[in-house]
Amino acid sequence: MFKQSALALALVACAALTHTNAATPRSESTAAAQQQTRDWAAYLASSSQLQAQDQAVLKTELKALGLTSPSRPAPTKEFGFDTEQPLEWFKTAEGKRIMDTILSFQTPSGGWSKRTDMAAQPRAKGQAFGVEDDYIPTFDNGATSTQITLLARAFKATGDTRYRTAFERGLQLILTAQYPNGGWPQSFPLVGGYHDHITYNDALMHDLMVVLHSVAKGKNEFDFVSATQRNTAQASLERALKCVLETQVVSNGQLTVWGAQHDAKTLQPAKARAYEMAALTSSESVWMLDFLMTLDNPSPAIINAVHSAAAWYEATKITGKTWVRGEATLTDKQDAPPMWARFYELGTNKPIFGDRDDSIHYEVGKVSKERREGYAWYTNSPNAVLKRYASWAKKYPRA
């Protein structure tokens, strides 16, 4: 799967970069295109190299044990323990035990899996690094960004250099995984399919940018990072912000919000699973809106992006209604807080809903009962962020 994905991406990159801008001297355009082609080729080579490295380590372990397939660690929601802990916790026997388990599950490439119990037993030789066949390591569902933050806090609390070393390896994976255009795939090394899209879904871009922002500032639990690491993180963050601005969707001449995924080359909103359409998304975009408002001295472009996204939320909010997961219709409730559909149709801003058969509907009641019960089609999470926006807007009024 990976080889096909990488080859396709490389071909698209080369094809896209053969076009020149008439306003740009041909020599400049050609040089830029050639450099971008080299950048993408190097990126894909890094992905292949790290994938081979991860596979080789596990293969060597299995061979030494006389096994042909790895055992699996215990699955769990998130990581099996409360990750919001005070610094003193990392000095306790329980904190040290869990952090040792986290160290054991770090892949040779530097990342971690999702839905893997990291509060139970440490990873054993010949055991997979996560519960899934693919997507190891990943940035999905807070994986890798969560472990990196925990390691920084553990090092701050204990001074154990193992935590710092593992932190640095994880940080390097984030830097290596960043696309030349500034975005991140869901998993790296690349695994193909929609997982290779630039991913806003489940706050993935947000989570990685928060880590980089913290490293770049070098304060609190990140005060141990070197000046070089801070500068590198800042440069990576700036590339990510450029990608965020470039992927903010323009609809009918107006800046709106973002998709859950964007194509890694065209930067347009892209489809993921059958019921996750190429669309504007309220749930994922609000995380990015929130992050942009944390930046000191935001540029005019970022200020405009925030105001535009907030205006879109105001224009698309649903009032006087509630929805209970699984129900086929909305319920009238006059004093209900505003809510939003998860997905909005590109170009029309109409709420849309998908199903496992790739069908798209304008009413949640048209979706199968299984998907109505198994997916969050509406959200009111933007309300809290929009309250913060009201204060932010006074400090940074729209030009």
Regions found by a protein language model. Give the residues of each.
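Residue-level signature of the C-terminal ends
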Residues: 105, 154-157, 177, 215-218, ...
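Eukaryote-skewed repeat-based solenoidal scaffolds used as protein-protein interaction platforms
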Residues: 164, 168-171, 175, 192-248, ...
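Terminal, non-catalytic domain-edge segments
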Residues: 23-94, 214-239, 265-272, 276, ...
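Long, well-ordered core segments of solenoidal/helical folds
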Residues: 97-111, 166-183, 234-253, 305-322
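Gram-negative bacterial Sec-dependent N-terminal signal peptides
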Residues: 2-20
